[in-house]
Amino acid sequence: MQKDTFKLRPTDEFIELMKLLKLKQIAQSGGHAKLIIEDGLVNVNGQQEFRKRKKLRAGDIVKLEEITISITK
C-alpha cells in the first residue's frame, strides 16, 4: 500500500477531488479523473465518493486501490 500526503497551501481551505487526482498524477486528465470517480473507485473518509468536485479539507483521507492520500494543512 502506498501512503502519501497532500499539503494544502496556507491560503487554501480545500482542494477538489478531481484536482487532487490530477496533481498526484493518478489521473492523466480531468476526463480520466471524472471516470475514476464516477466508477466508484475512490473512497473519502471510508465512504465511496461519486462527487468529482468534493471539497477535501485538512484531515480527510482519500483511498484509491492501493493508494492512500492524507490531506494536511
How does the language model describe each region?
Residues 63:
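Structural signature of FAD isoalloxazine-binding scaffolds in flavoprotein oxidoreductases
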